[in-house]
Amino acid sequence: MKKIFLLAALACTVMFADAQNLIVGSYNIRNDNQGDARKGDGWATRYKILCDQVQWYGFDVFGAQEVKKNQLDDMLREMPEYASVGVGRDDGKEKGEFSPVFYKKERFKLLDSGTFWISPTPEKVGVKGWDAALPRICSYVRLQDKVTKVKFWFFNLHMDHVGVEARREGAKLIIKQVLEMCGKEPAIVTGDFNVDQNNEAYHTMLQGGVMKDSYEAAAEKFATNGTFNSFNADLHTQSRIDHIFVTNSLEVTNYAVLTDGYWTPTTQPAPEIKGNAAPQEISFRKHIHRCPSDHYPIAARLVLKK
């Protein structure tokens, strides 16, 4: 009987330890458009690969950017273990790109959610903030782990690609919202910030010590490239324009830029070839190396402390 109780206690301890670990991510999935499709990088070609990638890495919660309604529907169909929260940026419903938060339904209870616009009037739908070229939004959730009962907030955004002031003031707005909304509860902010780690807006996110960059805070990191690839797997950059910021109560154990790719046949059928150093039983054909999006997803493993 003592052995049974001991095994049960050990099992509970392992379950609790696993529940304290949280894998989060950010993924600009690139909007669905015909220009990409004509080059072989269309959404229909890549979305199943993209969803398989998310599932393989086991994101517990992640933010996505540039998501149109049809893309959101495709992702939820391919990944039924996730629920999502978010609205279209143009009308606060389904028009325009979403910046949704996805979370695992079985693990988390949704306590609160919403969207605000990155502008001087965050509650006003569809507005452009400061010098932004487009309306920009931040969607958020407040979740509770069903096992540990720990509560935390998750914000996801896409900053403007043109407006310098909009990015700087937008970063100030995000910090203000985190302070006002979250209190002492942990908070995570993910997104395509459209600026790298050397930019003023990036450093604005770190001012006051409210948040830290998971890349810098990680005990271990695997990041052999930056986060933007322009649909070209041969390109390399030091710039990280996609970020995961966390409040100080969250421990960051690991961080990674996920550079997985896939291959499609060439337009003309390629002949079989043999590799000089390969076993002769192996044949190769020329294929095109592609990326699931024009951004690489990023991931961080966090520890949620009670």
Spans of model-derived segments:
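N-terminal, active-site-proximal structural segment of metallo-dependent hydrolase catalytic domains
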Residues: 16-78, 90-97, 172, 290, ...
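Active-site neighborhood of phospho(di)ester-bond hydrolases with catalytic His/Asp-centered motifs
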Residues: 62-65, 86-87, 188-192, 213-216
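Active-site metal-binding loops of divalent metal-dependent hydrolases
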Residues: 27-29, 157-159, 192-193, 296
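Short, Asp-centered acidic motifs that coordinate Mg2+ and/or phosphate
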Residues: 22, 60-61, 152, 186-188, ...
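Bacterial Sec-dependent N-terminal signal peptides
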Residues: 1-21
